[in-house]
Structures are given as structure tokens and as C-alpha cells.
Amino acid sequence: MKIEEMTIMDIRKGYVQKQFTVKDVVQGYIDRIKELDGKINAFITLCEESALMEAAVLDEKLSRGEEIGLLGGIPVAIKDNMCTQGIKTSCASEMLADFIPPYDATIVKKLRAAGAIIIGKTNMDEFAMGSSTENSAFKVTKNPWDLTKVPGGSSGGSAAALAAGFAPLTIGSDTGGSIRQPAAFCGTVGLKPTYGLVSRFGLIAFASSLDQIGPFTKTVKDCALSLQVMQGNDPLDSTSIQQEPMDDYVKDLDKGVKGLKVGIPKEFFQEGLNIEISDSIKEAIKVLEQLGAVVEEFSLPVTDSGLSAYYIISSAEASSNLARYDGVRYGHRAAVYEGIEEMMLNSRSEGFGKEVKRRIMLGTYVLSSGYYDAYYKKAMDFRKKTRNVFKKAFESYDVILTPTSPVLPFTIGEKTGDPLEMYLADIYTVNVNIAGVPAISIPCGFSKEKLPIGLQLIGDHYSEKKLLQAAYGLEQELGIFKEMPQQREVK
């Protein structure tokens, strides 16, 4: 089996059976990245030296018969908005181009404690604001399935790295679909956990009440194992889950979907949905029915205002969170200025890209006197309504099934001139963040042009175990993940 085809489970098994060393695996991925990432641009920083040093330590442990952890010897690539001690963390922005954090984010600490090896930091839309990874200050990431297409965003670097076989596990953040939409575009599994299940400490904030960290993997089983490591209370994040969740997500993963109640919201299958995506999702629904799931169409009236509410709330929070980047304490400082006010103005003008400025201006506007009630308050009222709508839906259904994105991966540069058209790529994902519930995107088919299509399963708060069981049952029957390693050979 080629290294780019291996799952986390394959690698763990290989270590147990002494088929290869940790150094072999890490070196194999590094060689592949060096050979092919010049075409894809998935990485901002490659951590070759430190990764090989950590691999040598783990090999020594294995030779002594010691345990190396749930993710022992698994290379992982981290989105470049999560703090990594001693490793540059830029948020793909000129503002933080030279920022080296003095500490690890909690997610990074947990991965390291489980034996994972940080292989690099991945490209993204600047400050996680975008749906195509075209807003990075440094490079445009390309979709490994078709180098003329975008990989989705904002975690496009992580999705592309996983799809290209540069790592068996990558980490992203999801504010309005930034894990699930790139997962759909790149043909991977991508999970946005329940808000609070995974600590946000050390994640550079975009919209604090919406942001959540999650994994990209090749298979649902890999995703379940990764979540096992990532989840849990963190005293450094007051919004993290208070009790320590003890769910073993891998155990009983093969429970099956017989008797599972699946809701299909009719609002997600109306005008604007690509016909090939619609057909692919409908085929997957038939498969669920054949497996014994109880499938029913129902109304989930959140799509009309969800996108508007999301962009109001997220931009408002961004304008506040990004106020700290003023050239005073850290981040970019303008070289030419007269006085403190001009220094701040010039630093922000030079440090932030066009999309970030657009959202800061929008956020400042909706929070300003005279407009707060008309926009921000209405959006927060809609948020409350959305939570209640989902709560009511989960009284009748175990999971909700929708397309992940209304469109196929689009051509690089196609939507950059029309922000509203770009924002519409998130129409099926934003409401999940507004409600704070978990959702997973899994591959469910391909277009005629062999572009991946993703299917989204949404669960109730903290129902990840049931959600992963449903995703696993469908994944195993569809068998699409088996096709992917061969397709991932980047030409």
C-alpha cells in the first residue's frame, strides 16, 4: 500500500506489526510534500526537522515496547490559525506573517500528548474569512482533483493536504462551514463538532461564538479516533464542555443505520442546487432506505435568513476580535507614520487583505449606534429561532441529511469579483454553526468531470457518537472512500 493511500488505522496497524518505522512514515510524507506541494500550495510551513526528531523519539519508545498513544506516530497538518509553540502561525495574513507563538493551542497539546507529529501548517483564507482559500496573503491553494479548481475554504489547505495524501490527519476550524465545505470539495471526511466539545484556546479568533475546531480524515473511523483525542473540557476555554465526555467514538461504530430516523429538509433541495449534487444525494438517500433507515421529508425553515444572520453575527464578532491588531503589541507595524493614530491606521491598512477589511467594516456598521437594532439584534433573534427549530427537529429525527454545498468545486478566480456569489457557497452549512450543533461531511459521489460531491449529516448537541455511526454505515455501503486514494495521485 502506498503511503498516500494509508489511513490512520493502517499506519497504527503497521507500527504494531513492525512493517515500518515512524521515521519511514514521516519521511515518506515529507518527500511527497516536497515533490508535489509546489503544484497544490497546501502548506505555509513545513516542519521537517522537528517532525523527524519526534519520529526518532517514538521509534525509540516502540523499540522498548512502550505505548506511544492513540495517535502515536501519526503525522498531522494544522491549519495556520492555531498556535504552535516555536512554529510560525500567520493566519495567512501579512498582519501575522512573522508571528511565532510562545505556547501551543490546547488542540495542539492534546494531539502531541496522544503521540501525533506536527508535520506542518496549512494554508487558509486570511483569518479564516473565505470559502475558497483564494484570500490567503501568500498563495492560492489548488484542488488536488483538478488543479484549476478551488479546494473550498477557509480550511482549504488542510482539505487539500489530506486529499493529496500529504498527511493522514489534518486539522481545520469551522465558523460557517470551513471544514465541511472544503471536505466536500476535496472528497474527504470533515467534522464540525458540537460547539464547546473541542477547546478553542489558542485558536486565533474570527467569530468566537461560532468557531469550532475539527478533523479532516480519509475515513469516518479515522475521524472517530481523532475526535476521541481532541474532545474534552479545558479550564482555559470557558465555553468548553464542563463535564468530561467519555464517549468512545470508535466502539460500536458499525452499529448500522437500521431504524435510524433521518430527516430530509425540503428547503435544502430547491432552486440553486446543482443537479449533479442533487442526484448524488438522492442516490445516497436510497442507500440509507435500503439499509433500513426511516427517511422522511420535513420543513426546516432556516435557509431564507440563515446566511444573512451568519454574516452579520460573524462580521460583528470579527470587527471586535480583530481590533487588537493595531501595530502596538504584536503583528505588522507600518514603517512610515506620524503619530500613534496614523501608525495604527497604516498598520491595519497594510496588514489586512481586502476580504478581512470588508468584514470588519460590515461588522462595525451593524454594531454602530442606530443600526444595532435593525441588524445585529435581528440576527441574534434569528439565532435563537434557529436553535429552537433544530431542537424541535431532533425531537422527531436522529440525524438530518442535506447537501454540504449547493455547487461543485468552482474554477479559481471565478467568484472572487462577486462576494455575494462566494458567500452563497456556505448556505447549507452556516445554520449548523448558528445552532451550535455537530455536522459531518462525507463523500457521496462524483460529478461527470470527476469532481467530488459531499453529503452533510447534522446531529443534535453532543450526539457525535450517533452521527458518526450514521456516517460510517453510509460510507461503508457507498464505498467511495476506497476509490479516493487512486484518484489522489496528483499529476
UniProtKB/Swiss-Prot annotation:
**InterPro entries, alphabetized:** Amidase, Amidase_CS, Amidase_dom, AS_sf, GatA
EC number(s) for this protein?
Answer: 6.3.5.7
KW ATP-binding (keyword) present: yes
Keyword list (alphabetical) reads: ATP-binding, Ligase, Nucleotide-binding, Protein biosynthesis
Q: Which positions are catalytic residues?
A: K79 (charge relay system), S154 (charge relay system), S178 (acyl-ester intermediate)
One cellular component GO annotation, for this chain's record?
Answer: glutamyl-tRNA(Gln) amidotransferase complex
Molecular-function GO term, any one: glutaminyl-tRNA synthase (glutamine-hydrolyzing) activity
Give the catalysed reaction(s), semicolon-separated. L-glutamyl-tRNA(Gln) + L-glutamine + ATP + H2O = L-glutaminyl-tRNA(Gln) + L-glutamate + ADP + phosphate + H(+)
Enzyme class name: ligase
Assigned protein family: Belongs to the amidase family. GatA subfamily.
Role of this protein:
Allows the formation of correctly charged Gln-tRNA(Gln) through the transamidation of misacylated Glu-tRNA(Gln) in organisms which lack glutaminyl-tRNA synthetase. The reaction takes place in the presence of glutamine and ATP through an activated gamma-phospho-Glu-tRNA(Gln).
**Assembly information from the UniProt record:** Heterotrimer of A, B and C subunits.
Q: What name has this protein been given in UniProt?
A: Glutamyl-tRNA(Gln) amidotransferase subunit A
